[in-house]
């Protein structure tokens, strides 16, 4: 038996819709990274972009476990301007409260993909939106029930 290697004509991409309301960020990002790479398919080929397209809605309602959204002891995100002393620090809580809460999901997924040309191509198949609406209705995305797969995937408001 020979090892299967997918050809570009054999790759079929589907559109998957995930509602991020009350979902745990790390678990969501890990699953989305697997779907974007195509590792959930039996026809996975490491050097081809055989993953699906993923649409995530309600990005502002994603949850962080533990004390990660705390300003003093939480999760920090760093960026550098390139100038001496130009390091900028922000917290996960500030990103979620900002005008662009979808960036926290994008950062989490991007850091779980390979950092090469193929990883950048696979990351371009991710679409994250704040709110319920998205412009991809023509692609007829299939709703993926990520919350129902495991009870740890969801974090309710009243659980601390």
From Swiss-Prot:
One Pfam family this sequence matches: Ribosomal_L13
Q: Which GO terms describe its cellular component?
A: cytosolic large ribosomal subunit
PROSITE patterns xrefs: RIBOSOMAL_L13
Q: Does the record bear Ribosomal protein in its keywords?
A: yes
Q: Which GO terms describe its molecular function?
A: mRNA binding; structural constituent of ribosome
**InterPro entries xrefs:** Ribosomal_uL13, Ribosomal_uL13_bac-type, Ribosomal_uL13_CS, Ribosomal_uL13_sf
Keywords (A to Z) from UniProt: Ribonucleoprotein, Ribosomal protein
Q: Which family does it belong to?
A: Belongs to the universal ribosomal protein uL13 family.
Classification via NCBIfam families: rplM_bact
What is this protein identified as? Large ribosomal subunit protein uL13
Q: Which organism is it from?
A: Orientia tsutsugamushi (strain Boryong) (Rickettsia tsutsugamushi)
